[in-house]
Swiss-Prot record:
Keywords: ATP-binding, DNA replication, Nucleotide-binding. Disulfide bonds: none annotated. Coiled coil: none annotated. ATP binds at residues 44-51. It comes from Natronomonas pharaonis (strain ATCC 35678 / DSM 2160 / CIP 103997 / JCM 8858 / NBRC 14720 / NCIMB 2260 / Gabara) (Halobacterium pharaonis). This is Replication factor C large subunit. GO terms for molecular function: ATP binding; ATP hydrolysis activity; DNA clamp loader activity. Residues 415-483 are annotated as: Disordered. Signal peptide: none annotated. Part of the RFC clamp loader complex which loads the PCNA sliding clamp onto DNA. Belongs to the activator 1 small subunits family. RfcL subfamily. CDD domains: AAA, HLD_clamp_RFC. Heteromultimer composed of small subunits (RfcS) and large subunits (RfcL).
Amino acid sequence: MSDWTEAYRPTTLSEVRGNNKARDAFEEWAKAWEDHREAVILHGSPGVGKTSAAHALANDMGWPVLEMNASDARTKDEIERFAGRAASNATLGGGRQLIILDEADNLHQHKDRGGAAAMTRLVKDATQPVVLIANDYYEMSSGLRSACRDVEFRDVSARSIVPVLRDICRQENVEFDEDVLQEIAEANRGDLRGAVKDLQARERDGEIKPEGSEGSRDRTEDIFAFLDAVLKEESAEEALQTAYAVDETPDNLLQWIEDKVPKVYEGDELADAYEHLADADVWLGRVRATQNYSYWRYATDNVAAGVAAVRQEDRGGWTRYGGAPYRSSRDSTRDYIATRIAESAGVSTATARREILPYLSAMTHHCNNRELTVRMTARYELDAEHVAFITGSGKTTNKVQGIVEDAETRRETAAVDHGGGIFAPAVDDAQSDTESDDDDDGDTLAAFGADEPKEESVNREQSDGTADAEESDDGQAGLSDFM
């Protein structure tokens, strides 16, 4: 079953409901852009259609979209790099493209340091139409606000929401009661996206069920019910239904599951779960690259159904999940690790994050393979926070602190002894260690120092049919180091 919020996302501005005045002002801004060349801020509550309107406008105008969203690091350097890419694309294509900067009011986090000033420069210097999207207009800097026009999207009235829900029911061929649609519209208080999610959550056996029936969306506890459903209780199909009932986007669901799965899964379950999360991340990357939001459904399939399907047994009891994932520190930590892996393996940062990091997490889970964890820490120059992120162990624990100290000693020794380099001693040790272990352990240890390629890697390159396969970034580069 597809996500109705994506299946029925407006494709033209004429389909944007409940904000006719804002829609018309936005369209007027676009058509007159050659004359004024100013950026515009679309602001208003979540779920009122700001992002949908931006993409619908791009379709109407025939403009390709280049988007920077909240999941991207938005430091000064990243925004300047993004601006350079936008300018480059415009030069190559020769036409207009729409630049979308999502959550422009959320640049106060540590990882976005310098981002507000860089974004202000971007909108002032842009040679392409720029749309900034914000929930809270006054959370943005005064300099950024003064550099842009603004269009306010107001909360969508229940009177405007009901026809949307009715149209979806007819398209999906499900029975409905007008009173139930009115109830859903009023309960969501201007949030059209939330109303559509509620509608889908209440659909059972070709009928929209009334409040209190099975499937009604709980807006206060739904994220933790979702975690329990995926990680502990429900089948793959049931977990997917729960995912559709949660008022969160697939990228946010991915962050929640990725952050909490080590609290419940372990061993093969955890490794298999990371496989599905990596696949979900690939689909989300395609959404960012193509702006085709129909791919969201495949990301959700992996995050919910995929992770639930690899669970070997149901679990009861209460789990201390903790609060929401801390995006600023968590993402900056992951970005650093992915960058170090990418530099070492000769792959892109995206490939390192999607394809390699999940394997590292599985192989070094809770530092069970201490030698491998030390070797990894030394190779990628990681500190306690990075080791804790990868292994799931606390950064202040004795084992993590000991691993970091041993890795530092290994780096210092290698700096003095230039004969074999930093990893040669580790490989020599590994050869003696693996005499009594199976071949898989030998291959795993080789990831952190072997100079001679494994037979698997050679065979993989031959099967690819290209001599420079390892230099290409096809989404699989670097995996042979860990197989």
